[in-house]
């Protein structure tokens, strides 16, 4: 096997990931302080793969399903936002392989079925979305990526293939009680930020154009469902830790510096919480950025179709709108 410096290569791989780390907004610490703390957790885990000359195995709970709210997304199926994110993840693995021949692989642990009833998206829609994600991987030649979902968990599917029952088994075997979840979330600011972010997602996703009820009632419902989503999400994380005990645990959300999880961006965004399935890809000055559909429409974005299917937007930077566009472009380049 080709010789390489274990410490140097391990540090280089970690640096590759740190370039895209999601931070908590308004963190009181410097980036250098945070990265030193993250390194204390992640470097030994990366080094364990390098010492054995094995591919770096990462897991990423992500790509559940599209938001049901047309104010945020283009439709129910993956579009340019997902495509660009998958291409980024695959290219990340390819870059690692340039200086570490065993390379890296990322297992996308699609979690839509884990909480479909709580996010008000039916299981058939989620299955269709996941099938399209796998098609995108195949069509784009993303050989470093693979997909794992609730239906692939043999320790659960040996009993049933019904998703309602699979969710019950997941909670029974891997979840803490909602009371324990609430107590943990209240322990620190990061827990509260997560709770508020999930609540906001659920509220926005339920604020459909045809909704005529009270916004206060919708907010209350979102707060109640938020704890359940976090409970299921953490249960899924516990299951994944059992299935892939050595894997580097990536996340779509900002994480504390002491966490085993490392939050990463998959494409530029103005929001440290926004994801491809909660937004659309908008091309601004030749660079794609994640935004909500309504935000793009307010900037007179032009909808682009590929093979007759809505794909993404292009925002032309006309002089009279430069004042609106510039803060977005600056945020993109800063990210």
Swiss-Prot record:
Belongs to the isocyanide synthase family. Pfam families: DIT1_PvcA. PANTHER family: SPORE WALL MATURATION PROTEIN DIT1 (PTHR37285:SF5). Disruption phenotype: Deletion of isnA and isnB abolishes rhabduscin biosynthesis and decreases virulence of the strain. The keyword Kinase does not apply. It is an enzyme of class 4 (lyase). This is L-tyrosine isonitrile synthase. Keywords: Lyase. It comes from the Bacteria. Its EC number is 4.1.99.24. It catalyses: D-ribulose 5-phosphate + L-tyrosine = (2S)-3-(4-hydroxyphenyl)-2-isocyanopropanoate + hydroxyacetone + formaldehyde + phosphate + H2O + H(+). InterPro entries: Isocyanide_synthase_DIT1, PvcA, TyIsonSynPvcA. GO terms for molecular function: lyase activity. Involved in the biosynthesis of rhabduscin, a tyrosine derivative which is a potent inhibitor of phenoloxidase, a key component of the insect's innate immune system. Responsible for the synthesis of the isonitrile group on tyrosine using the C2 of ribulose 5-phosphate as the source of the carbon atom.
